[in-house]
């Protein structure tokens, strides 16, 4: 999910070479998740494109599936949610060897997001793919790339634990 501003929370992950973007300067100002896209070794596409997406909720028309719609340059489409923690879960339909993710949280205002990204083959037993629960670095327009040894997962879940915007909405 490449988000210009991974409405992060939302959640965004990137594949090795593919990005999905979401976010808009007109988004709900209190709590905006990131966008996500994912890739696998040897796979140049966004593994999250067309995937089933569920979330703990959404704000207005900022539906979960907008976090992985592949419209990286459409600033008017993103996933937004209020409350902490909030989560976004992506079902790729079948287990895939995932080796990279890229998250694009909303970066204006120097926001610092705390979140974790987990993967699962069955949607019940989760393994950590990326842990930003102690993050102290502000989000930027480059997003946050994560590379790791290939992990076989069907589901990817990003859980936003907080931000420094003065509220958890």
Where are these regions (language model features)?
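Bacterial N-terminal signal peptides
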Residues: 9-18
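Disordered, acidic Ser/Thr/Pro-rich linker "stalks" and the adjacent N-terminal cap
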Residues: 23-94, 106-111, 131-140, 148-150, ...
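Short beta-strand elements bearing conserved aromatic residues within extracellular beta-rich modules
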Residues: 115-117
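Short beta-strand-plus-loop segments that form exposed binding edges in beta-rich domains
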Residues: 159-167
């Amino acid at each position: 999910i490449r988000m210009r501003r991974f409405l992060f929370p939302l959640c965004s992950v990137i594949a090795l070479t593919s990005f999905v973007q979401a976010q808009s300067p007109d988004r709900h100002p209190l709590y905006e998740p990131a966008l996500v896209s994912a890739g696998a070794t040897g796979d140049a596409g966004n593994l999250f494109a067309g995937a089933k997406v569920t979330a703990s909720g959404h704000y207005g028309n900022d539906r979960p599936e907008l976090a992985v719609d592949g419209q990286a340059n459409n600033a008017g489409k993103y996933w937004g949610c209020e409350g902490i923690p909030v989560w976004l879960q992506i079902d790729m339909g079948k287990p895939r060897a995932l080796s990279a993710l890229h998250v694009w949280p909303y970066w204006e205002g120097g926001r610092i997001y705390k979140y974790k990204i987990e993967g699962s083959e069955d949607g019940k037993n989760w393994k950590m793919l990326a842990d930003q629960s102690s993050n102290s670095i502000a989000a930027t327009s480059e997003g946050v790339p994560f590379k790791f040894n290939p992990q076989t997962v069907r589901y990817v879940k990003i859980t936003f634990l907080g931000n420094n915007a003065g509220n958890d909405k």
